[in-house]
């Protein structure tokens, strides 16, 4: 990518106009006090560089029970939240509508509510191109099969009456909209859903800053001009919480907070590692200019990794998403803010299409590589929990939370962890056992000797195991140079994959979901049936063996044949 093709830094001025002061020690609003945790400490090497000693992971006995510290299980409610009545005639403006969650959210709103219109921001050259993209990526999507069956011959007419494409770009000033479109939305919109983001973990730092920090800021500034706005909804990620361990509660991030802090008694504090968003923007801009004669993309990816590690996040994506939350909370003034933090989002569990998914996400490259026999080992603690949530559960929780908080009360911030570990835990050894069962029953045509996944806690041990297997394979296949080259590339890819997702294999935090459970308790019986948010009902064996991987193969791996 040339310098001219790189991210424009003109929008960075938007953030620098408000210099956020975070030099003083910030109050701890993120965690309750916990005297049972060893919180870690900062030490210094012989050359003066600080390094972080991770805190001890709490023992299982120290954690709440399966539903500990959560609201009681839901009881029947005749009144409910009032989801249908809230959305009746309401107009929604959504960014990221062609993404996995955005598309699922749109489908559910069209199928289950009687809302007014959905304005969908579409990156396109003109109105005609926007309509074409909306038709191709949303109306013709396999995800809309139930809606298509429901409306029959009037399906296209119905969707076109509800979905209004808006030409724009969240990475441009004023979101790239023309004045007429902007005025129409400002007059009519009730709820804004900000779902657009870059989900590439280690993308260019400048790009991640622009789309995950500046873009939400631009949208919030636009939101303040909307006359009837009732709620601003921001789709974030549970991993904005950084390298913290133990139980993580649904609290908003505060400006300048880093990913290291645990509680008020920690030696690690935001005063020692203050995160200044303006400084980070300027640093990325300078790096972009300085590296124009070199490999700009490589340099800016490296910079993102370095900054994330320094401030206590696993990667630049998580760090910039955290910064996005901070800037929204700091600049919203009297705009009510709802933040949804899903964990690892994967395919639909139930409706409208079990197994439907878009894109090769998180665990999916691991699953497919394993199914081909190219990834027999992984970096993870087999006894630790992983946290996965089907995308339909995220969409339903978002809709229910919007209805609950969209009725004007006061301009507050509400945070929801959309996660499963607290109420329906899944260990790594269980997940990989289910994946093994699937490929044993339905092997890929190109699969090679599927064995049970081996898990390592050291990268060096994993690398040696992979290379030893390749050496054995080369010995059997002979001296064919092409085969040796292919095997070498496979090992390199496997190592890269394991290293990229190493953080998830040893992640020792658990996302508290008290707000989601309280939401479930408030829902009526009918609402619970229509908007499934109860994660205790997920059967992980069924999900992996019969739903998710089948969907992955159909929708992502281009319909790979099953060799049963």
Briefly describe each language-model feature range.
Residues 2-200, 205-209, 216-217, 225-231, ...:
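N-terminal Rossmann/SDR dinucleotide-binding element
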Residues 112-114, 222-231, 331-336, 404-410, ...:
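Secondary-structure transition/capping motifs at alpha-helix termini
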Residues 401-500, 509, 518, 522, ...:
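Mid/C-terminal beta-alpha module of Rossmann-like enzyme folds, strongest
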């Amino acid at each position: 990518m040339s310098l001219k093709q790189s991210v424009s830094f003109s929008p960075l001025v938007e953030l620098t106009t408000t210099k956020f002061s975070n030099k003083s020690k910030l109050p701890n609003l993120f965690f309750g006090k916990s005297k049972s945790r060893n919180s870690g400490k900062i030490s210094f090497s012989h050359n003066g560089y600080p390094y972080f000693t991770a805190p001890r992971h709490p023992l299982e006995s120290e954690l709440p029970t399966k539903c500990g510290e959560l609201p009681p299980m839901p009881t029947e409610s005749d009144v409910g939240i009032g989801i249908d009545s809230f959305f009746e005639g309401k107009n929604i403006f959504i960014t990221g509508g062609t993404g996995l969650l955005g598309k699922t959210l749109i489908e559910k709103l069209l199928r289950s509510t009687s809302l007014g219109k959905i304005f969908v921001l579409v990156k396109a050259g003109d109105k005609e191109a926007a309509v074409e993209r909306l038709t191709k990526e949303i109306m013709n999507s396999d995800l809309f099969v139930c809606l298509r069956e429901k409306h029959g011959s009037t399906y296209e007419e119905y969707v076109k009456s509800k979905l209004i494409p808006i030409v724009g770009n969240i990475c441009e000033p004023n979101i790239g909209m023309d004045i007429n479109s902007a005025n129409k939305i400002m007059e009519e919109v009730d709820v804004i859903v900000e779902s657009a983001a870059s989900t590439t973990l280690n993308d260019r730092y400048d790009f991640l800053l622009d789309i995950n920090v500046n873009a939400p800021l631009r949208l919030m500034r636009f939101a303040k001009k909307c006359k009837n706005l009732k709620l601003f909804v921001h789709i974030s990620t549970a991993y904005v919480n950084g390298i913290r361990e133990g139980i993580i509660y649904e609290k908003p991030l505060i400006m300048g907070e880093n990913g290291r802090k645990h509680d008020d008694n920690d030696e690690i504090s935001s005063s020692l590692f203050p995160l200044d968003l303006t400084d980070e923007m300027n640093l990325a801009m300078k790096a972009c200019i300085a590296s124009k004669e070199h490999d700009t993309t490589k340099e800016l990816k490296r910079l993102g990794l370095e900054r994330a590690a320094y401030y206590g996040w696993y990667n630049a994506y998580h760090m910039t998403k955290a910064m996005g939350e901070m800037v929204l909370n700091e600049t919203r003034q009297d705009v009510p803010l709802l933040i949804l933090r899903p964990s690892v989002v994967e395919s639909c569990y139930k409706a409208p299409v079990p197994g439907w998914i878009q894109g090769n996400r998180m665990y999916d490259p691991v699953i497919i590589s394993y199914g081909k026999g190219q990834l027999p080992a992984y970096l993870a603690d087999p006894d630790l929990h992983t946290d996965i949530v089907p995308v339909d559960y995220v969409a339903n929780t978002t809709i229910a939370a919007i209805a609950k908080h969209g009725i004007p009360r006061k301009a507050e911030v509400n945070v929801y962890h959309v996660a499963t570990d607290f109420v329906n835990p899944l260990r790594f050894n269980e997940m990989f056992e289910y994946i093994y069962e699937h490929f044993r029953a339905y092997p890929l045509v190109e699969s090679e000797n599927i064995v049970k996944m081996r898990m390592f806690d050291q990268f060096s041990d994993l690398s040696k195991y992979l290379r030893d297997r390749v050496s054995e394979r080369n010995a059997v296949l002979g001296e064919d140079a092409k085969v040796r080259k292919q095997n070498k590339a496979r090992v390199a890819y496997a190592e890269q994959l394991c290293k990229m997702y190493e953080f998830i294999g040893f992640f020792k935090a658990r996302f508290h979901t008290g707000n989601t459970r309280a939401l479930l308790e408030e829902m009526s019986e009918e609402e619970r049936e229509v908007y499934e948010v109860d994660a205790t009902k997920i059967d992980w064996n069924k999900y992996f063996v019969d739903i998710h991987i089948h969907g992955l193969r159909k929708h992502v791996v281009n319909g790979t044949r099953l060799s049963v």
